[in-house]
Amino acid sequence: AEWCQPCKMLTPTVEELAGEFEGQVLVGKLNVDDNPNTATNYGIRGIPTLLFIKDGQVVQQLVGVKSKAEIKKVIEETLA
């Protein structure tokens, strides 16, 4: 959401990790205000929310601003 300051704070970290894991992961952003049905379908109740999807299934979810190390750990677990 455009008004979400925590989302804006998290963006540079997510972009850094997208670069580090380029070719291994696909990173996308979704504005919940513009896509409320998608947010509802994934059970998103708070933002920012990071979903980690493997083989079409959500395998991990992080809600709130997280450190680069925390997010990287979940990416590595998801890739394992």
Positions of the model-derived regions?
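Non-catalytic, surface beta->alpha helical segment in thiol-disulfide oxidoreductase systems
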Residues: G46, L51-A80
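Active-site loop/turn elements of alpha/beta-hydrolase fold enzymes
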Residues: A1, V32, D55
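Active-site loop signature of alpha/beta-hydrolase-fold enzymes
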Residues: Q24, N35, V59
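Short conserved loop adjoining the S-adenosyl-L-methionine
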Residues: P36-T40
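Conserved helix-turn-beta segment immediately C-terminal to the redox Cys motif
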Residues: M9-L30
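Structured functional modules or segments
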Residues: K29-D33, G43
